[in-house]
């Protein structure tokens, strides 16, 4: 029962709130995304997935793993294995991919960002999401942006459909894949950061534009396996911006809290900006309220 509830929870999190959304803002500095790989070529992160009760005690039956990779591509490159598609002759950009495993269910997500304005800013160009249960694909999505139009092809249990989500006149718009990693590069990340944006949502049951709000609630220190592995962070942990993500019309009260490192983290001679140290999301099961927790274990850069 618990595993079935978790699968439903994670599906909602990805499809509605997104284990990842992707971000861009062409009108204000508040949402502009710096080129996160401007001085290196690759980053990867591994998270341990688990559930906790209100006192922080572990809840059995919810363990999993989540990995994220970021890779730089040059102008004219071919990106293979982009969901069910291959991207040919892409603009200079960054591919962000995620892989979440919970029980026998796997979630594959990805976004390709084009680099614009003299190699300074990231703008989402393509996205995909694939869900497998017991090795079988139950949902897939491949999409491309044409301005503020999100053109998609979706397959649900073998039935294919296509459509367009029009974001209209919104100023800030975001994609629903790899959002968490993308937010690391906002140029105005601070304790006073608060803004709203729209994003296209395409799930098995929905295809629409929704409003999302991000707000930094303050600074907190976080300790986990990642901080324990580093001599410079073992004692006090790492200072993080505690950031709340919520949907204007929430589904079953779903929201997320993200913890981004305040300062750069040195790795292999380079600095990683605002790494995502932890994700928390509340859920209810068996009459109790728990939290799904994604805790950073390892990070690599080259």
PLM feature segments, named:
Residues 27-146, 195-302:
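Acidic, serine/threonine-rich low-complexity disordered tracts
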């Amino acid at each position: 029962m618990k595993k079935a509830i978790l699968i439903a929870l994670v599906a909602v999190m990805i499809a509605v709130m997104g284990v990842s959304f992707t971000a861009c803002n062409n009108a204000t500095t508040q949402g502009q995304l710096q080129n996160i790989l401007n001085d290196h070529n690759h980053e990867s992160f591994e998270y341990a997935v688990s559930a906790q009760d209100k006192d922080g005690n572990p809840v059995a039956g919810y363990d999993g793993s989540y990995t994220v990779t970021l890779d730089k591509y040059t102008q004219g490159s071919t990106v293979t294995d982009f969901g069910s598609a291959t991207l040919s002759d892409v603009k200079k950009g960054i591919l962000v991919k995620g892989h979440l495993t919970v029980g026998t269910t796997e979630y594959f997500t990805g976004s390709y960002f084009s680099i614009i304005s003299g190699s300074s800013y990231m703008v989402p160009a393509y996205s995909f999401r694939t869900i497998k249960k017991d090795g079988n694909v139950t949902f897939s999505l491949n999409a491309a942006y044409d301005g503020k139009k999100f053109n998609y092809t979706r397959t649900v249990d073998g039935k294919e459909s296509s459509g367009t989500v029009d974001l209209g006149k919104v100023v800030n718009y975001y994609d629903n894949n790899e959002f968490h990693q993308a937010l690391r590069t906002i140029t105005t990340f601070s304790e006073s950061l608060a803004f709203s944006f729209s994003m296209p949502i395409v799930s098995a049951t929905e295809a629409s534009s929704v409003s999302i709000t991000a707000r930094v609630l303050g600074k907190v220190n976080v300790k986990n396996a990642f901080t324990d592995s580093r001599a410079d962070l073992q004692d006090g942990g790492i200072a993080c911006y505690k950031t709340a993500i919520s949907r204007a019309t929430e589904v079953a009260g779903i929201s997320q809290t993200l913890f981004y490192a305040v300062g750069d983290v040195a790795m292999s001679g380079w600095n990683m900006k605002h790494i995502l140290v932890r994700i928390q999301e509340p859920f209810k099961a068996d009459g109790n309220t728990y939290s799904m927790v994604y805790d950073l274990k390892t990070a690599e850069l080259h």
